């Protein structure tokens, strides 16, 4: 025996917002009308959590307004992919003079469009980096700044760098003291 029934969906985003694909609406006397919603446009996903609204209509209006605001006023900026080469840094007393540094993770930031022009990206590394250095050692940071925000992401060594032998270290240290370089 097969039962059929019609179930209306109360999530206003699903039928009135392009890219909406979920989640849940709810209502209680204590919390009012609420919604947890999700939408994706152009490869960017936004999540929305609302609660405490007085009517289902205000829930619908506010959820649409906030989703539109999020997609219209923020831009996703991609900086580096996980494992992508970022910079070479000098080493101290290493068998190689430089070590390649890469991003530990994908670095993508959703930034208010009004701050795109004043955004600043810096690579923070204290050089020279003492050896030995092992692959995946955190040896620096990528810092993204805009407005009053500073976001930092780890930079990892992409290779192993062994320390020079004893006599080579002494020679390099003397050379550094006299000429100021490794």
Where would I find each of the regions flagged by the language model?
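Domain-terminus/edge residues, biased toward the C-terminal soluble/receptor-binding domains
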Residues: 1-182
């Amino acid at each position: 025996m097969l039962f059929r029934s019609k179930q209306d969906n109360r999530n206003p985003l699903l039928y009135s917002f392009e890219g909406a694909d979920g989640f849940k609406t709810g209502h209680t006397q204590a919390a009012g009308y609420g919604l947890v919603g999700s939408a994706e446009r152009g490869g960017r996903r936004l999540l929305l959590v609302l609660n405490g609204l007085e009517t289902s209509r205000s829930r619908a209006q506010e959820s649409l307004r906030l989703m539109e605001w999020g997609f219209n006023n923020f831009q996703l900026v991609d900086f580096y992919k996980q494992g992508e080469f970022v910079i070479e840094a000098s080493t101290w007393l290493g068998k190689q003079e430089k070590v390649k540094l890469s991003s530990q993770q994908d670095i993508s930031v959703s930034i208010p469009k009004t701050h795109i022009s004043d955004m600043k990206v810096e690579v923070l590394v204290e050089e020279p980096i003492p050896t030995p250095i092992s692959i995946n050692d955190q040896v620096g940071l990528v810092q993204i700044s805009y407005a009053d925000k500073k976001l930092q992401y780890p930079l990892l060594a992409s290779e192993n760098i062994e320390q020079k032998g004893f006599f080579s270290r002494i020679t390099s240290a003397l050379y550094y003291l006299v000429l100021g370089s490794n």
